[in-house]
Amino acid sequence: MAGRAILIAGPTASGKSALALGLAQARGGVVINADSMQVYGDLRVLTARPSPEEEEAAPHRLYGHVDGAVNYSVGHYLADAGRVLRDAWAAERLPIVVGGTGLYFKALLEGLSAIPPVPEAVRAAVRAQAEGRETASLHADLARLDPEGAARIAPGDRLRVLRALEIRAATGRPLSAFQGSRQPGPLAGVACEKLFLAPDRAGLRARIDARFLSMMEAGALDEVRRLRARHLDPMLPVMRAHGVPGLIAHLNGALTREEAVARGQADTRRYAKRQVTWFRHQVGEDWRWLTPEEAAREFLPGH
């Protein structure tokens, strides 16, 4: 199996996990997560992580292994994914990388800029200085310090603006100075079968809405209640997962349950649209776009 992998991408609720599990069972594979929210242990239900029964049916890696208090970066993911890929090949298992986070796939295939880590004290200081300020104002600061880097970041993208300011504060150098040098990705030179699941739009919207209701029935609100009790920084990725802000607003009395559900459904539908758009413009022509039904017929005959 060394030097081979299957990559399965697609929007949320497109059936990626079911296809990955079926392939892992049929081909002796190991399922490797490529979803930036499913890494967090706090949100099994709300991020639609594989169930314990599914995880027992085939090996699964990089699911729920990160605490919600951690700001888990693409660099962290790349290091973890490189390790589990090597372990899979050493065990003669086929890696099946599945998820909807485009930057994870891009980093696996193309590598990542060699940006040094930012000390936590520096990160905290930058965020404390930024608290209460508009993102556009922070972006203007960045434009003065790093015009080239600021030009690559939307003025409203607070997380990326803060990240660039943190790097400047930690290293004394602009983010753009590091973006020319790349460390190769662990899938560089690997024979990869690349699949993108693309359901029809109406069907996907219906699945997203129905799945959110199922999540509520399965305990999503209790999950968010436990997360809220931790009093984490609202800027952390886990606190911005689809459904979390609306359900916290409901727990705080600002939204009804029905309003929180509607917000979670709408946020997830918008995210799915962005996922499709990103992949359409960012990945190469060697990715095969299939409907979930086409993929099942081709790769899981008899299922």
From Swiss-Prot:
<keyword id="KW-0460">Magnesium</keyword>
<dbReference type="InterPro" id="IPR018022">
    <property type="entry name" value="IPT"/>
</dbReference>
<feature type="site" description="Interaction with substrate tRNA">
    <location>
        <position position="123"/>
    </location>
</feature>
<comment type="function">
    <text>Catalyzes the transfer of a dimethylallyl group onto the adenine at position 37 in tRNAs that read codons beginning with uridine, leading to the formation of N6-(dimethylallyl)adenosine (i(6)A).</text>
</comment>
<dbReference type="GO" id="GO:0005524">
    <property type="term" value="F:ATP binding"/>
</dbReference>
<dbReference type="InterPro" id="IPR027417">
    <property type="entry name" value="P-loop_NTPase"/>
</dbReference>
<keyword id="KW-0067">ATP-binding</keyword>
<feature type="binding site">
    <location>
        <begin position="12"/>
        <end position="17"/>
    </location>
    <ligand>
        <name>substrate</name>
    </ligand>
</feature>
<dbReference type="Pfam" id="PF01715">
    <property type="entry name" value="IPPT"/>
</dbReference>
<comment type="subunit">
    <text>Monomer.</text>
</comment>
<keyword id="KW-0808">Transferase</keyword>
<comment type="similarity">
    <text>Belongs to the IPP transferase family.</text>
</comment>
<dbReference type="GO" id="GO:0052381">
    <property type="term" value="F:tRNA dimethylallyltransferase activity"/>
</dbReference>
<feature type="binding site">
    <location>
        <begin position="10"/>
        <end position="17"/>
    </location>
    <ligand>
        <name>ATP</name>
    </ligand>
</feature>
<keyword id="KW-0819">tRNA processing</keyword>
<protein>
    <recommendedName>
        <fullName>tRNA dimethylallyltransferase</fullName>
        <ecNumber>2.5.1.75</ecNumber>
    </recommendedName>
</protein>
<keyword id="KW-0547">Nucleotide-binding</keyword>
<dbReference type="GO" id="GO:0006400">
    <property type="term" value="P:tRNA modification"/>
</dbReference>
<feature type="region of interest" description="Interaction with substrate tRNA">
    <location>
        <begin position="35"/>
        <end position="38"/>
    </location>
</feature>
<feature type="site" description="Interaction with substrate tRNA">
    <location>
        <position position="101"/>
    </location>
</feature>
<dbReference type="InterPro" id="IPR039657">
    <property type="entry name" value="Dimethylallyltransferase"/>
</dbReference>
